[in-house]
Amino acid sequence: MRHDCTDFRQLFLDDVPMMDMRAPVEFAKGAFPGVVNLPLMTDQERQKVGTCYKQQGQAAAITLGHQLVSGTLKRERLHAWASFAKAHPDGYLYCARGGLRSLIVQQWLRDEAGIAYPRIKGGYKALRTFLLDTTQQAVEQCDFVLVGGLTGTGKTDVLHQLNNVIDLEGHANHRGSSFGKRATAQPAQIDFENKLAIDVLKKRARGIEQFVLEDEGRIVGSCTVPLELYQGMQQYPLVWLEDSFENRVERILRDYVINLCAEFVALHGEELGRRLFAERLLQSMSNIHKRLGGERYQRLSEIMRLALDEQQRSGGIDLHRGWIEGLLKEYYDPMYAYQRDAKADRVEFAGDAVEVREYLKARNR
């Protein structure tokens, strides 16, 4: 018989299957990768029990809970829990704090399905605290270096060739710029933090103690970099990636036009996907309207519209280079040049993609 679990580190390192007893509304606010939500109560049932608890106390709330989850409902949920337990005999169950909900499910599984299934002591809150501490400890104990560079130099491409990268944009499902929103949604803030911490945990378990990050702002789309990490990023040494203007334009064309359009088409089909892609590009330009200024915004938006019309009509993408070149020369490059000057004393190396990659690999030896 397996015992209830307190070894949170091994749970995440081994990707142990877990079922979450919390209500859907709790699960949506934050969960762990791969965990299955099989709630004891629906959102409405949980709300009723919570109100009863406040007004009449714990005993009355427990009685109401048993009344709400009974008969056919109870049998259906018990079947789902038992199916998970049989499919994942090495797994665990948990609720918010390792309290009544997980105890009740554990008891019902044992008494009515004949399955002894362990739970996680302390529940979701204990697991979440462990992951927050994991990130904090890494910031305190590990070595970090940032990769910076003008827009389109291929920072993400370089990072993906390293085994000690913490991919903030990947975890946030966002490219980091005003145009960085993907076709699929970003994770909830807590999910972003949890994935980041698990990534750090697994890499440290492999002996990695030096991490490479892209030089990001505090906000990556709608996800916020943990404060302790972001504060460190204001001081970490910086490696500056360089590339030609022409290569940068082509890379942006690839990422923000060709690949983004393909993402939308894959999700929504040809016609709707192309329309949503066009709307996304125009909205991204609109998001920096004030920073561009009226005249520049109108000019670049018109070039973008013409490019989108041509792409829709013939599939041609050449006209997109016009607004990309304009944005780089008139907006992104001056902004990044200013930021680089402000961080000049932290730049320990500069070079092209091959040179930067080799430098970072050597630095990690």
From Swiss-Prot:
SUPFAM superfamilies: Rhodanese/Cell cycle control phosphatase
Single GO term (MF): transferase activity, transferring alkyl or aryl (other than methyl) groups
Group of enzyme by EC: transferase
InterPro entries xref list: Rhodanese-like_dom, Rhodanese-like_dom_sf, SelU
Catalytic activity: 5-methylaminomethyl-2-thiouridine(34) in tRNA + selenophosphate + (2E)-geranyl diphosphate + H2O + H(+) = 5-methylaminomethyl-2-selenouridine(34) in tRNA + (2E)-thiogeraniol + phosphate + diphosphate; 5-methylaminomethyl-2-thiouridine(34) in tRNA + (2E)-geranyl diphosphate = 5-methylaminomethyl-S-(2E)-geranyl-thiouridine(34) in tRNA + diphosphate; 5-methylaminomethyl-S-(2E)-geranyl-thiouridine(34) in tRNA + selenophosphate + H(+) = 5-methylaminomethyl-2-(Se-phospho)selenouridine(34) in tRNA + (2E)-thiogeraniol; 5-methylaminomethyl-2-(Se-phospho)selenouridine(34) in tRNA + H2O = 5-methylaminomethyl-2-selenouridine(34) in tRNA + phosphate
GO BP, sorted A to Z: tRNA wobble uridine modification
Residues the record marks as active site: 95 (s-selanylcysteine intermediate)
Key words, A-Z: Selenium, Transferase
E.C. number: 2.9.1.3
Span of domain Rhodanese: 12-136
Highest taxon of the lineage: Bacteria
Oligomeric and partner information: Monomer.
Protein task: Involved in the post-transcriptional modification of the uridine at the wobble position (U34) of tRNA(Lys), tRNA(Glu) and tRNA(Gln). Catalyzes the conversion of 2-thiouridine (S2U-RNA) to 2-selenouridine (Se2U-RNA). Acts in a two-step process involving geranylation of 2-thiouridine (S2U) to S-geranyl-2-thiouridine (geS2U) and subsequent selenation of the latter derivative to 2-selenouridine (Se2U) in the tRNA chain.
Family: Belongs to the SelU family.
Protein known as: tRNA 2-selenouridine synthase
Native organism: Pseudomonas putida (strain W619)
Lineage: Bacteria, Pseudomonadati, Pseudomonadota, Gammaproteobacteria, Pseudomonadales
